């Protein structure tokens, strides 16, 4: 609908330009937003206020000319002027109802695929191997997964790339520890965190051990067979731990998506050679760097992008440049999205610029850093265990499931007291699993990607507010309507007729699903989808309360309201699926 309104406004602008009301050459970015109060229309635009000055007119006068010039359209009932010159657009209720009937008959809920389709590489999760995933890996993993799902739904070809840290000093440290204590260490491999901490303790306390670790890194990089065999074993164990977490989270990541730092080792020397050939490298204290004039420190000096250390070693920037070239040359990406901590913003700005100057990626290939804030504890400080250690992600998920199980078990006892059929233990465990994992994911996804947030089990497991349990309950509420009816959603007759205010409000929200999904894909911000679903659930609750469904006044009204309920249920389920969340028929 927003695209239609933009097109109508553009047609009006073209007409006013042709008759001399507007000067030629204006190319405004036409903004169309949802109104906060639907009594003032469904959508609003500030285009008249934007163009009043170049037109030499008062905003309301220009708005009046625009209203006259906007062509009539079946989707619009009327256009009004509000305040200092806003244009308020009212949807035609008959057209709106018919569009929802079409959406209900469509497996895609009326959401058109975006065109032309792109090949999009999603760089997500990317934990360092040789130790277990911790809570800091949650955001990249689930935000990246949600955006990938949305892009796939809109027709893009999505290539997930798990750029794991499988190379570097930590492996020399682990190899040295395994060399010292082969029997005990092999046993400890099943708990990577214990093994890693023990090796790190030796590395920090013993200069001799640290020297040996560095020697083994050199041997590993030189292709020593024994070192490579053990390194491979470390990675296999570490990746198996990661996969268990991915499976528990329900994200679409598998071993086939792993493309770690080591995959680019053979290209790093060539990256440096190509940068040299382009005349981009400068030697600085033995290191090879690219200096970009637009990136300067506090003293005003250009900041270096170091691609090779004085000792010959390579850095993250070198690997990232090799990965960008691979993603262009081999994966043929049109767009690459990096879901990496916001604190790496400068790094990505620099390497993106170096990649373009070096010709590693073409001008038309989009490189976007989808930075995110940090997850903190309830006290607002970095999330730690009680003894100050790192919280394993798997432990967090297990606690979430345990807490959710206790919650649903308590509610199950209340069901029995009310005379309702209680769930058995198997059902309770499954409900607890879904509620627990969904709650952790939704609490994160519902926050703006770039914001920090405080992790709080009590808030995220609440059945009130913008939470997963609230939305899951909304889904079960819709399902209960059709259980009582004894009929499936796909067997409905009649058509939608919008009469009551609650019906109109619900219908207007349902009609915006496609626009919303496209916005999430464009900006990489799943919280917009969360906010949409939360508002949709609230509007359905109001509709359910004020508009009797199964006891409607006549069959036509009953059919209409059943169809609205069915479309609401399907939209909630589709939206939650795009976020990577499971749904329940009963809870």
From Swiss-Prot:
The source's superkingdom equals Bacteria
Write down the top EC class of this protein: ligase
Q: List the record's Gene Ontology CC terms alphabetically.
A: cytoplasm
What is the name of the protein in this document? Arginine--tRNA ligase
Leader sequence residues: none
Gene coding for it: argS
Catalysed transformations (reactions):
tRNA(Arg) + L-arginine + ATP = L-arginyl-tRNA(Arg) + AMP + diphosphate
Subcellular localization is given as: Cytoplasm
- Assembly, per entry: Monomer.
Keyword Cytoplasm belongs to the record: yes
Among the GO molecular function terms of this UniProt record, one is: ATP binding
The entry's family comment says: Belongs to the class-I aminoacyl-tRNA synthetase family.
PROSITE patterns documented for this protein = AA_TRNA_LIGASE_I (PS00178)
Q: Which Pfam families match?
A: Arg_tRNA_synt_N, DALR_1, tRNA-synt_1d
EC? 6.1.1.19
User: Which BP terms does GO give this entry?
Assistant: arginyl-tRNA aminoacylation
Question: Coordinates of motif 'HIGH' region in the sequence?
Answer: 127-137
Keyword tags: Aminoacyl-tRNA synthetase, ATP-binding, Cytoplasm, Ligase, Nucleotide-binding, Protein biosynthesis
Q: Which NCBIfam families match?
A: argS
The main place the protein resides is cytoplasm
